[in-house]
């Protein structure tokens, strides 16, 4: 994880079993070490904020493991003067596009006292961008409530249901649409080649088809999708089609420009061979 540069990490601490107001000195993340008996701890670092007890982190991890086929892992953590964040990754919900992996999980956040003190929300990480998606589930910080841990785990379960919905949405609409558009674009390019009247072999045909944009140019489009508010509306399919047409239109326009250059190279090569044969 990361620790903000303005934080002075001069004190280590074993975290307690209950919620307490943070002490007026800096507490940093302590990882397990072969030469130490310290455990992982997550704590906010101001007298105005709350820390996240390590027992609660373990309880959350254990609870999430009961609903996941593969062990849940702590993908990342961040400690600042404003907030403490822990990101739980679900390996069975990660999606791969060629060599790129989309990480899916839940972000647990603790902040200042108030309505935003504790929040759980699904996140998606793709192309070095971590973005919160879907609904956020919040719990107000109330020290008098003895069942806080149970309530916090309960909203984690609700957030997990939201995460499953989002992943299903990705697979059924976004990735399906991407595959359809890639196939459609290759059909367009193949038709253009035939209309030019070039009788080229499979090798040259494949070289031309290799100019087609594959999934990799769609990072910008994917980021738009997962950030779009329309993702959670009934008009999502229409919105995604319009955005895809715009992105694909630009992509295929440049591809056909490249194809035109490729065609010109073939013409010059044929002319050169014809000239050499005449000699």
Region spans (language model):
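Feature for intrinsically disordered/low-complexity regulatory segments and propeptides
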Residues: 1-59
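Long, contiguous regulatory modules within eukaryotic nuclear regulatory proteins
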Residues: 41-96
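Intrinsically disordered, low-complexity regions enriched in serine/threonine
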Residues: 1-12, 76-80, 91-279
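Polar low-complexity intrinsically disordered regions
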Residues: 33-40, 60, 66, 264-279
